[in-house]
Every structure is written in structure tokens, then in C-alpha cells.
Amino acid sequence: MDSSTWSPKTTAVTRPVETHELIRNAADISIIVIYFVVVMAVGLWAMFSTNRGTVGGFFLAGRSMVWWPIGASLFASNIGSGHFVGLAGTGAASGIAIGGFEWNALVLVVVLGWLFVPIYIKAGVVTMPEYLRKRFGGQRIQVYLSLLSLLLYIFTKISADIFSGAIFINLALGLNLYLAIFLLLAITALYTITGGLAAVIYTDTLQTVIMLVGSLILTGFAFHEVGGYDAFMEKYMKAIPTIVSDGNTTFQEKCYTPRADSFHIFRDPLTGDLPWPGFIFGMSILTLWYWCTDQVIVQRCLSAKNMSHVKGGCILCGYLKLMPMFIMVMPGMISRILYTEKIACVVPSECEKYCGTKVGCTNIAYPTLVVELMPNGLRGLMLSVMLASLMSSLTSIFNSASTLFTMDIYAKVRKRASEKELMIAGRLFILVLIGISIAWVPIVQSAQSGQLFDYIQSITSYLGPPIAAVFLLAIFWKRVNEPGAFWGLILGLLIGISRMITEFAYGTGSCMEPSNCPTIICGVHYLYFAIILFAISFITIVVISLLTKPIPDVHLYRLCWSLRNSKEERIDLDAEEENIQEGPKETIEIETQVPEKKKGIFRRAYDLFCGLEQHGAPKMTEEEEKAMKMKMTDTSEKPLWRTVLNVNGIILVTVAVFCHAYFA
């Protein structure tokens, strides 16, 4: 069946002028305005009701969060606009398999809450590189990991989210891509710079609700339009564009016909676009890196009131992660059915006409569905949903990136920095991050056949596995030491960067114009590459650790799984260095007790807005400090809640197995 008969509006979005008029109505605009007012109100409320004047308050929300905002924030930080654009786009191009990536996380959030976070809390750390410094000693691993994490944020998270959010705004409002980016970032940076982690978590919770309500409504509209689930399965396989040749060039059938295995998540190990061994093992390695060792995710868990709230948040997030298959991937596939000529275009000149890039237009599958299918008012709601997902991800990343920079890099360079100076440095760093990310957007636009999600996963496959190997061994094998971990990371990085640079130099190509990259380098699927890279890093770490001196247990109490319950006092490997750093801070605290000059009204307003006001709280006694430290590193739970949460964890893993089996 010729799918162009599906909707009289099939080509309505080709000219920005028409789309600009689509969203120029009172209902849409008022919903968007209400959305921004509510978000700013929640951000301001969090800003003035929480303590942001200390590093712990700004970066860890004062360890006071309960389970439901943590679960919502974990989900919202993970689901950016890159997911709406990327998952729906890859779904439109190749079927449901990409949704299985999301289900992989159901098992890993349980691993995070039950195995990894207890160790991080007992270690008493704020950042992941800080944990590695306590575990291995020395500074080189900490600085290396901080820099690599910041690079990963720029290459995968920030630039991909900015790009996908801008695609959506460009399609809905007709705004220039870069103007759209500028507006988004201005608002996002404003409440991250001023509000700290509490503002981020509360706005994330609000945005999760908006995101789920909006996308469920759109999913209902989409399935109604296409005639239900059975009709959707049948029509997707027939969604083939009519223009498949350009002059004398006729494109191969595989470039524009839906895959025969579109409705299976486990695909052929050799010819599949997402081969099943890579899907199970390679994806699990990437998911382990992201969910169990990434600053953005772990920071939310560390802000929890106690261990039960951590586990509750992880379980809530796990159930929410069931949704993207149905609210993002399948609507993307329906978009291909309804607007086949545009979404499934294969001729470069046609694609450029529809979406401004020659490699394919699947990235606009979800935005097109919103702009074309939703009635007035609801269209504004969906634009708010996209903005919500974009801004919640960006605020999370900005807050975590500034934490990494401030605590792991800046504090090393400026050992005598006061608390106030650290706060200002963290906020200024966010502005630098934004500039670099915008510069990377054009590269994201053309990578991986124009499929955003494949681009994100491939970069992660080249840089993430060595980090996963180090954390896994650091926590579960006490024999691993600093030289082993460091050289494992360095070798893994060199191999990963070689593949990444080669792929960018040759271009990833597309079905119509394959890349000239040598098969020995680019021919290995990125998920298989992740397995190989993980294995090389793992073996390197183990071998070098066995050939070098072990770390005495006295330095490892409560830093690895086998010693997690030890009561002895730990002598930190970095204790001497910490004493040097802490010395000047005491003198600074003494200095601040000197009577200050009264500040002017503008200066007081500025300090209040940025959370830099100094509260004259009395200094804690040594006993109080000890009690506070005990509370901050306590992982005990009430027996009833531990049982309830364990049962829920088992149910969640069972649901994950069922979903994989049902759609296999």
C-alpha cells in the first residue's frame, strides 16, 4: 500500500513558514508559557528552601532526598530529548530492537542500588573519581577519570541532547537551529547555576510527570491513527517510500524497506544491525558503566536520606524504564507509517529537502508526529515534554560535570581554595561546557547514518568499557591495585580513541554511500568492540595487579565488597594529601569569624541568588563531626523495608526477563 495516502498532511512540514504557523496559536503558546512558569517556580522554591551555600548542599542536596524524587530524577536524567529523537528515529529505521537497550537497565539499576551504592556511601565520597582515589591512592586515576567523564558528557550527552532539542524546536517553531539552542541553554543554565542538586532533582520530578503524561497521550493518538497494534505491525512492514532512485542511481532495496526482523529484539549475530551477543553482553558492559559508575546517576543515589530510599528510587526508575519502548520507539515506527516519504526518505536530495541532512530523516520521526498529529494545546504540551526531557538531562549533566571539575580538578590546582571559591568555579565551568558542546553539534548531525542513538552508543562503546572494568574490579576484587587500574585505563583509552578517530576521519557512511573505513577497524560492530575492549582492559588490570604489590587491608576497609562490614578504622591512602588540603580551610574558617563589613543591597541579593551567602553557623565539635560522619556513611536498613525492597527487586528483574523473552 502506498503510505503517502495515509495523511493529507504528509508534506506539510517541508517549509518552516508553515510549521511556524502550526504552533502560533493561543492554546499551544499558553501551555508552553505555563510550563516554563511552573518549572521556574519549582526551581526557585528549591533554591530558597535548601542549603546551597556549602559543597555538600549544592552537590548532594544535603543527603535529604526521599525515594520518589530520586527515582523520577534518575529516569529524567537518563531520558533526554536524545531519547525522544534517537530511540524513535532508530525505531523508524529498523524496528523495536533499540527499545531493548532501555530494558537492559532494569537489571543494572538493581545492581546499582544493592551492590555499588552501599560501597560508595560507606566510602563517604561525593564523586566517582574521588572513590577511585580512596581505593587506589595517588591522583592520576582521579584526574584521568574526571577528564574522560567530562569528554564523554560533551561528546555524547550534552551535544546530542542539544541537537535533538533544537531539531524539535526548529520543526515546531521554525526557529534557526542555533537560536533555538541558545534559548534552551540560557534557561537551563540559569537554574542549574543558581539552584544546585536539590533544584535539579525537584524540577526533574515535575518534568518526569509532564514527560510521561504527554508521551502517553501522543502514543494513544498514534495507535488510534494507525488502527491499533495489529494494524501497526502489518502497516510498518509496508512503509516504503515511492522515490527510490536519483537520476541513473537506483538505491538498494535494503536501504528503504523495513527489516524482516523489525519486531524482534534478538537479531542475527553476523548480519543483524544489533547482533544478539552484542546486545546481551556488550550492552550490559555499557549499561554497567552508565548506571553504576557514572557521576550523573550515582550522585542522585548519594543524595538519598538512607539506603532504603536509594533502593526505592532505583526500583521506581526501573519500572519507568519499561516505558520508552511503548512511548518512544513504537510512535517512531508509526511516524514512518504515516509520513513514509519524509521519514523513510532514501534519496539524498529528498532527505535534504525534508530535514536538511543528506544521510536520512529518521531523526525527525517523533517531532513530525507531534507537529502533525496533535491538536492545538496538546501540541504545546508535547513541545513542553521535549523541553522537559532536554532540560532535565542537561541540568543533571551540568550539575554533575561541575561537581567533577570542582572537586577533582580545580581543588587539586587550587589547594587553598575556600568553599566560596569552589562554588563560583563550579558555576563558571558550566558556561565553558556549554560553549564546547555547541561547537560539537555539527558533527553529531551527520554521524552514524543520521541515527542519533547509534552515534551515542558507539561513542560510549569506544570510551566506556575500560571504566566499567576498573570499577567492577575495584569493588569486587581487593587484590587490584593502582598500577593495574591505571595502565588498564590507559591501554583501553588508546584502543578506543584509535577506533573513534578512524571512524570520524573516514565518516560512518550510510546505506546509500558506505564508508571507506578499513573493515578490520570499522567492520567490527560497536557492541562487539565494547566486549573486546572490556576484555583487554580487564585482563590488563588483573595481570599488572598480580605482578605488582597488593594494597594492605588497612587501606581498604569499607572500600570493597569483601571488607564492606569491617569496623576497624581505615587509613586512607590519600590521608596525608587530604591533611595538606584541609589545613588552610581551617584557617579560612577562623578568618571568617572576624566581623565583616556590612554588604550593600545588590551584593546581598547576588549572594542570595547564587547560594553564596555565608551562614554564621557554630563550628561543630569533634564528637559532633564524628557523629555526622557516621550518619553520612550509614547503610543500615529496617528489616521490614529491606525485605519489601528485596522482593520488589526480584519482581523487577523477573519483569525484565519476561519482556526480553516476549519480544525476542
From Swiss-Prot:
Changing S159P: In GGM; loss of activity. The record marks G43, R300 as: Implicated in sodium coupling. Changing W67A: Strong reduction in D-glucose transporter activity. GO terms for biological process: alpha-glucoside transport; D-glucose import across plasma membrane; D-glucose transmembrane transport; fucose transmembrane transport; galactose transmembrane transport; intestinal D-glucose absorption; intestinal hexose absorption; myo-inositol transport. The keyword RNA-binding does not apply. It holds the Pfam family SSF. GO terms for cellular component: apical plasma membrane; brush border membrane; early endosome; extracellular exosome; Golgi apparatus; intracellular vesicle; nuclear membrane; perinuclear region of cytoplasm. N-glycosylation is not necessary for the cotransporter function. It comes from the Eukaryota. Keywords: Cell membrane, Disease variant, Disulfide bond, Glycoprotein, Ion transport, Membrane, Phosphoprotein, Sodium, Sodium transport, Sugar transport, Symport, Transmembrane, Transmembrane helix, Transport. Enhanced by the interaction with PDZK1IP1/MAP17; but unlike SLC5A2/SGLT2, PDZK1IP1 is not essential for SLC5A1 transporter activity. Inhibited by phlorizin. Possibly modulated by cholesterol binding. The chain crosses the membrane at residues 25-47, 67-90, 96-117, 140-169, 177-193, 203-221, 276-295, 310-331, 376-406, 423-444, 452-477, 482-504, 526-547, 645-662. Changing Q295R: In GGM; loss of activity. Changing Y290C: Loss of D-galactose transporter activity. Has strict selectivity for D-glucose. Acquires D-mannose, D-fructose and L-sorbose transporter activity. It is linked to Congenital glucose/galactose malabsorption: Intestinal monosaccharide transporter deficiency. It is an autosomal recessive disorder manifesting itself within the first weeks of life. It is characterized by severe diarrhea and dehydration which are usually fatal unless glucose and galactose are eliminated from the diet. This is Sodium/glucose cotransporter 1. It comes from Homo sapiens. The gene is SLC5A1.
